[in-house]
């Protein structure tokens, strides 16, 4: 699921909905999230984004969003701090360690490869956007295209018997 959720409340709401849907299935699935925060924007929300992700997903991958003119690693560190501050008791049962994968395409692939049938992967923050702004340059990038490419590769791997 690709969603524009780019504020802590939105992340929390989407994850709550996904968790409820997963729990309603005959075989409850797990939830993963790929999340980052934009540069040159509200810095106070970064740890809150990480916290919301960690409270609502078994698997959290912190990555780059639109770093703009800021250091992407510094932005990720702030999101990670919020995610890692959430204690095990406040995370979903079976939650894994929070991961950091700077490259957004690689982060998406990491989450999709983690997922099993019945799981849900939320790619949060960019939604409909078709570019990633880095150092004042907007590079072509669409989460939806990356998801399609990764899933196509997974289907091809399964058909070949390699997965």
Describe the predicted segments one by one:
Residues 1-163:
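ATP-dependent carboxylate-amine ligase
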